[in-house]
């Protein structure tokens, strides 16, 4: 199986780190609104890679995140560290809590994920479930 390696900018034969075992992580939605057709393209491409790996006999540990906190509006202006949290902004817009907004749009996303017959990741990880690990990772990067 050949894939485009964005690091080397070359089409290369896929070679797993461990024989027939692949870890695959894809970014999932930020659940402050309905997912766009452009977002669905990303998830469909991830599904294509996942199914291709399975077809070629790989055991795939597939993980997708759900961002339910901390996605700031400043990334639209080129500064991801500024602006308002998208979930807080949506909560004000809808007159709900950020938790309610995240739950509603997560359910909508998962329902449509199934309607599109996309392969479910082995693990769905919500950002709020991994804040401690994220802080530790940033600390390591800053060293």
Regions found by a protein language model. Give the residues of each.
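NTP-dependent nucleotidyl-transfer catalytic core
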Residues: 1-143
């Amino acid at each position: 199986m050949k894939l485009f390696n964005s690091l080397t900018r070359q089409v290369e034969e896929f070679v797993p780190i461990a024989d027939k075992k692949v870890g695959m992580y894809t970014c999932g939605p930020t659940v402050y609104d309905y997912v766009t057709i452009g977002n669905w393209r990303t998830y469909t491409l991830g599904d294509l890679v996942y199914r291709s790996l399975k077809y070629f006999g790989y055991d795939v540990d597939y993980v997708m995140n759900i961002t339910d906190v901390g996605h700031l509006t400043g990334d639209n202006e080129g500064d991801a560290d500024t602006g308002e949290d998208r979930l807080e902004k949506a909560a004000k817009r809808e007159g709900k809590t950020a938790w309610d907004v995240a739950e509603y749009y997560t359910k909508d996303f998962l329902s449509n994920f199934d309607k599109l017959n996309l392969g479910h990741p082995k693990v769905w990880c919500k950002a709020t479930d991994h804040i401690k690990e994220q802080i530790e990772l940033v600390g390591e990067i800053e060293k």
